[in-house]
Amino acid sequence: GKNYVGNGTFSGKTMEDFDPNTIGNRNVFIYAPYEASWQNNERPHIINILDSLDCGGFQVTAYTNQEADVAKIAEMTSYGMVVLSTHGSGGGKAVLTGEIADTTAAAYQTYKAMLQGDSPKMGISMNITISKQGNAINRKNVYKLYASYISGLAGTFPQSVILANFCGSDQTPPLRDA
């Protein structure tokens, strides 16, 4: 999908083809892989705001911490509102998942081809804080997704509102437009 900040087109349509007062559906996707490590989490606030709206009827699906893995990000294309509350990487070139990058796990074999080549769709961010409890800090290597992975997802966003709350979310055209 594309966004209005990007090139202003959506599958051959322009902004004028859409009713600005209509969102494709009331399904909300919240992807928050670092709640266990962040002091301030926006997910509960967003849910409270949606619950308080007169128009109501929002159905929220939220994935947090390690549940917010690579496979879950593929679901977001069918939601009317998407919230990505995560880390960005590489100056706006990638978005981090909560999935631990374990080269002995079965998932690694699935991802291996996407991690290789001159233009990989995925990468690995090293030594990322995934949780904090007092002075105990848990750091792991996690998968990150480049714009080519996101723009290659099956499905189309149903006139969705996308809130990209991660560092670098709009720094580079490829990730911004993905």
What is each model feature region?
Residues 105-178:
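Catalytic cores of nucleophile-dependent amide-cleaving enzymes
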Residues 3-121:
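A domain-level signal for caspase-like cysteine endopeptidase catalytic cores
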